[in-house]
A protein has these predicted regions:
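Positively charged, small/polar-rich N-terminal and surface patches that mediate targeting and assembly
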Residues: 1-125
Length: 125
């Protein structure tokens, strides 16, 4: 029986010169990450505004978010039974401005409800 050498196969992909060299890459134009945290009571209002303003068509929603900010705590317990909801949106600078206006509008409309909004830079990889 002949002695066969096993060849080692390298599965490491060749380095890409740029994102555009990767056929899986689809530029989404997302440059801003927005985190919006509000009481669950405002969830429908945000979704309605997103639809009317045609922004945040793609978002991540985290339900049952607990925390304490500048309004009443939302801890989901016997003392503070309410909970928050959190939206994470990746969007363009222009959509970010529209969403900020939605946040300000709902803050004016619901002055006693907690609404937090954080904006940071994002890069799709």
């Amino acid at each position: 029986m002949a002695d066969k050498k096993k060849e080692r196969v390298d599965f490491t992909p060749a380095p890409l010169k740029s994102k555009k060299d990767d056929e899986r890459y689809t530029p989404a134009g997302a440059v801003v990450r927005m985190e919006i945290i509000c009481t669950q009571a405002l969830e429908e209002d945000f979704l309605q505004e997103f639809g009317e303003q045609k922004v945040a068509a793609r978002y991540t929603k985290l339900a049952g978010v607990m925390g304490a900010g500048y309004s009443n705590p939302c801890l989901g317990d016997a003392i503070w039974p309410q909970l928050n909801v959190m939206f994470i949106v990746y969007c363009s600078e222009a959509d970010c401005e529209v969403i900020k206006n939605i946040v300000w509008k709902l803050r004016d409309k619901y002055r006693t409800e907690g609404i937090a909004c954080f904006v940071s830079r994002a890069e799709e990889v």
